[in-house]
Amino acid sequence: MASGKIIKLVVFELLEFAAFSIPTLVIMEQFATANQRTKSERTHYWLIVSCSIAYVAVVSLLIWVPVKVVLYKKRHLYKKIIGWRPVLVMCVVLTTLPSFSFSIAVTEVQKNINGSANSLPESLPDLPVSLVLLSLIVVDIIEKLRQYPLRGSQKGYEDNDICITSLQQIKTVTEQVVQSDGNPASAQAAKPTAMSQPRNHVAVLAGPLEPSFQSRILRTMSQRDVRAELFLRSFLMWADTVEMLRVAGHQAVYKSAWLYPVYIFSFISLLRMVFTPKNPLLNSLGILMQDLPFVFLRLSLILALGTITPVLGLCKNVLVTISYIYFNYVTKLRPFSAFETSPF
């Protein structure tokens, strides 16, 4: 009987390969259908479908499978890869980029068939683009889940942080009590030193205490697991890009040249997925590759086409960009570097 690790590995690999191959086949079939309307025969349709199948087969045999085998067999090489994920690189470059390109090509083919953009449908089908993003998110979740067992319980991120912080505070208070009880002279000698130090830090005001439940029902409802949070965090992280690609299906966008910047900036935003979740550069790259470009793109869309993109999204991009610049760089300047003494 196969062990749990082998079953987990096989299931994960099958899901990743499906997420790697299916979006390209679906987008290319849509392109073949749009191209068939210009010709009465189905030769071109099956030719395009055959080329898409051949592309997926060649890329899988020459790139996907060899890279997967090397990563599985040569663990010492895998440990040398720091800060980025090869599997996501293959998905973004070999699946997402061709899919976005042929999504634009589908629109251009339909324009050529009808002679103008006015005869196009009111909205583009949402399934192909949603399938591309869903496949990327699924691969991202699988890569994060590999380090966790699928059975048993795992604490959430915030629970671990709370435990670590509490232990550090208890250790610090205990050390101070032991030092003052064991050697009063040293404690008195340490007072001038403490007073002579500049007041560069103040006690951090603790937030409201979290409740602890005695009821079994409430305790059950308050359960948190890091593996379940992975799904939530992964989908929330790319919600802004999903909304931007939804705008691309609006008739005022895909019937005009605005379709190109929307797809280009959305793809640039998705490039962040190739980095590891704890990469120190991820926050700054999120500003440079998503929030800051989306500010100008959303503002331009609103000024040119009206509120086809939510104003809330624009406010989110502006506030995230300003807060990142202020708290990471402006607060280091001399006028803003003084510590606050008021807890409110």
Swiss-Prot record:
Keywords: Glycoprotein, Membrane, Transmembrane, Transmembrane helix. Glycans are attached at N114. GO terms for cellular component: membrane. Its main location: membrane. It is a multi-pass membrane protein. It comes from the Eukaryota. It is found in: Membrane. The chain crosses the membrane at residues 9-29, 47-67, 86-106, 122-142, 257-277, 294-314. InterPro entries: Uncharacterised_FAM23-like_TM. Belongs to the TMEM236 family. This is Transmembrane protein 236. It comes from Mus musculus (Mouse).
